[in-house]
Amino acid sequence: MATEVHNLQELRRSASLATKVFIQRDYSDGTICQFQTKFPPELDSRIERQLFEETVKTLNGFYAEAEKIGGSSYLEGCLACATAYFIFLCMETHYEKVLKKISRYIQEQNEKIFAPRGLLLTDPVERGMRVIEISIYEDRCSSGSSSSGSSSGSGSSSGGGGGAGAR
């Protein structure tokens, strides 16, 4: 477990050197936070379509849960007004709790699914909730397989940029 976390930290440090694929927000149902489940061709040889779609659908479900207005959200709002929002100094909102759950889920997916395949999933919060960023790394563990190095997908995702070292 400790070596997996160490490897994830190494991948994050070298994120600016990797090819990046961006999964855009899906506004087909309005402005609710959800991401497109369309499988990017750059990931074709790296991860199974089903695993990718399952991950994005799970994230979309978490974001729907975070934005759901229920009794607890209503009570939070009432308490916030009654205490001039001081209540939030000692209490997390429902939205913050779900965002933490999402961060844990992304960490788990990186450890179990993405990192072993040379991929790194970035929390959408780190990108302003605009995109899911997936960094693609060259195969360091496999012996001489250069088939993934000659993929034609590197030009279509180079519009990302150099802002990956913020953490």
Swiss-Prot record:
Expressed in brain, but not in lung, nor chondrocytes. Residues 156-167 have a biased composition (Gly residues). Keywords: Cell membrane, Golgi apparatus, Lipoprotein, Membrane, Palmitate. A lipid is attached at C78, C81 (S-palmitoyl cysteine). GO terms for biological process: protein targeting to membrane. Residues 142-155 have a biased composition (Low complexity). One of its GO terms (cellular component) is Golgi membrane. Palmitoylated by ZDHHC5. Palmitoylation is required for the maintenance of ZDHHC5 at the plasma membrane. It is a lipid-anchor. Pfam families: Erf4. It comes from the Eukaryota. It is found in: Cell membrane; Golgi apparatus membrane. Residues 140-167 are annotated as: Disordered. One of its GO terms (molecular function) is enzyme binding. Play a role in cell adhesion by regulating the plasma membrane localization of the palmitoyltransferase ZDHHC5. May be involved in protein transport from Golgi to cell surface. Shares an exon with the neighboring tail-to-tail oriented gene CRTAC1. Belongs to the ERF4 family. This is Golgin subfamily A member 7B. It comes from Homo sapiens.
